Amino acid sequence: MAAAVAEVPAGERGATRVADRVVAKIAAQAAREALRTAAPDTRTDAHASVTIRRRDDRQSLGEAHVRVAVELGYPSDIGAQCGTVRYQVAERVRALAGMEVPDVAVEVERLHSPLEESAGRERVR
């Protein structure tokens, strides 16, 4: 039995496919991790959508084009936070899913102001 397996070339034995929703979950979690690191005291949230372009060869898992929507605290360095998210998402998807990530689009859905949050806690007379 072992001799029969050894005769089949590695590329013809099968392939691993990572589902789009799994890559989206990895990307969203990576974005949340990046935001917690960049602004630990600020309320943040993130979710992601992914488009995967699969290649015909079995040696590659394909490319993941990621779009991440985030909520950030304000005032803050929004550009730096988006850059941190972009880098972290690309690295985590590459490491955990084995896919190349040529681009990560970061969309800021909402900004949270400390004044807005404290206004909700004030007592009404």
Residue ranges and their predicted role:
Residues 1-84, 95, 99-125:
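Contiguous, often N-terminal, cationic amphipathic patches that form binding interfaces
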